[in-house]
């Protein structure tokens, strides 16, 4: 169930009513009532889940979901005790269901600094807007014209600079957010459909653990359902993008213009050079390094240094670069001798 501090759960619907709204066909269990969406792996009897890819067939067989949305080819694989909706656009149908069952808590009214602060050591500069349920730990400072969305929890001795927005997030102690940082915006998720891409509601959170620094104008998206987590003492430079569902380890360093796609996991003590890019669902091992400009399309084992595009182990990259340079020089020399 999405965190109620950040998401409102709307009225439950029967499977039949839901199918009518999302463009699916009920196979069985139209009278079943569902009140939430969830992934196959964590869904309970009150939730609706979907199968978007055959590689998750095992999760479908084991799910506890009260209802599942499946493509026509997977109807027979659905659990016998679950209601079933069939759709050729299962993920898009699930996205539509999510919008019918959950809604982000909006900043309809603000509270005062005194209501949010743990004590009088908290400093809130002019122009700050604080949503309902915000809590700010002692010794923290919120910069001018920053907006803190409903339910956000900020730890002690934090420094949030001017023009920052924070929503759907939990911040530990000693967190620093520099000017213009964007924490907790919706992740980039869209499901294909015959009528065009459908936005997938992002129902997770951002968790910034103790000692995290986020540079100016950097963005960290909230999770699609699970959380985006930045580990203790990780330092993020200006203009860095971290996608939804990422789990970044402790003591990571990310130089400017690094881009981390969704669902990336990094171990502790990893380093990313400037303009490094990491593809989605990649695992970066503990202590690994990505050189500046590297484009990572495969998992990196612990302790290795990778470079280039597509990124590969540094020594291999250097050998190949030298070989290519020699080949180019030989061809150039042969061409000049003919002339």
Predicted segments with their positions:
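Structural signal for interior beta-strand "rungs" in well-ordered beta-sheet cores
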Residues: 50, 111-313
């Amino acid at each position: 169930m999405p965190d109620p501090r950040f998401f409102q759960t709307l009225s439950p619907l029967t499977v039949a009513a839901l199918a009518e709204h999302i463009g699916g066909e009920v196979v069985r269990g139209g009278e079943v009532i569902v009140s939430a969406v969830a992934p196959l792996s964590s869904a309970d009897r009150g939730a609706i889940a979907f199968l978007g890819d055959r590689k998750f067939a095992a999760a479908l067989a084991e799910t506890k979901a009260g209802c599942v949305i499946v493509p026509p080819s997977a109807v027979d694989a659905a659990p016998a005790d679950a209601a079933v909706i069939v759709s050729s656009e299962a993920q898009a149908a699930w996205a539509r269901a999510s919008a019918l069952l959950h809604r982000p808590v909006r900043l309809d009214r603000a509270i005062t600094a005194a209501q949010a602060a743990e004590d009088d050591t908290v400093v809130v500069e002019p122009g700050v807007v604080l949503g309902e349920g915000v809590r700010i730990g002692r010794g923290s400072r919120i910069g001018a014209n920053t907006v803190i969305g409903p339910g956000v929890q900020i730890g002690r001795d934090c420094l949030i600079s001017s023009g920052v927005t924070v929503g759907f997030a939990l911040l530990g102690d000693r967190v620093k957010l520099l000017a213009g940082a964007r924490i907790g915006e919706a992740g980039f998720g869209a499901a294909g459909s015959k009528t065009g891409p459908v936005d997938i509601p992002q129902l997770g959170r951002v968790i910034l653990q103790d000692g995290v620094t986020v540079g100016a104008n950097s963005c960290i998206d909230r999770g699609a359902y699970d959380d985006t987590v930045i580990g203790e003492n990780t330092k993020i430079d200006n203009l860095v993008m971290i996608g939804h569902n990422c789990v970044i380890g402790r003591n990571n360093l990310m130089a400017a213009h690094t881009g981390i796609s969704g669902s990336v996991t990094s171990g502790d003590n990893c380093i990313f050079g400037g303009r490094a890019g990491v593809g989605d669902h990649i695992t970066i091992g503990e202590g690994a390094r990505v050189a500046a400009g590297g484009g990572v399309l495969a998992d990196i084992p612990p302790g290795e240094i990778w470079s280039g595009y597509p990124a590969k182990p540094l020594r291999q990259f250097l050998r190949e670069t030298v070989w290519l340079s020699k080949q180019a020089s030989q061809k150039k020399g042969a061409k000049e001798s003919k002339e």
